[in-house]
A protein has these predicted regions:
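Residues that scaffold, gate, or flank divalent-cation-dependent active/transport sites
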Residues: 1-99
């Protein structure tokens, strides 16, 4: 099953997607310039494509994603100011959108 929702964070609009799998859930939040994803996704692919992507793990829903510490980030996300280990998902999205 797939769910979608619109989110607004500090005046910025994002689309959130949740896709159930047989053994878990795939979670993604997408802005106009940013992507926040769960552990199902690959930093290597984001780097190859040049996407601003931050990765959070151990999350079960969109609120968890926004509050979790970023575990890893693509090179373009790092250049936008995302700091794995100290930035939250919410902060990462805003940094990637605002730069």
């Amino acid at each position: 099953m797939m769910k979608t929702r619109k989110l607004e964070i500090e005046g910025k609009n994002f689309s959130a997607v949740e896709i159930g799998t047989p053994h878990g859930t795939i979670l993604l939040i997408r802005g106009s310039k940013s992507i926040l994803g769960c552990g199902y996704f690959s930093i290597e692919t984001a780097n190859r494509l040049g996407d601003r992507f931050a990765l959070v793990t151990g999350v079960r829903n969109w609120d968890d994603m926004l509050n979790a510490s970023v575990k890893d980030a693509s090179s373009p996300a790092l250049e936008a100011g995302v700091h794995p280990g100290s930035s939250t998902g919410r902060e990462a999205l805003l940094l990637m959108e605002n730069s």
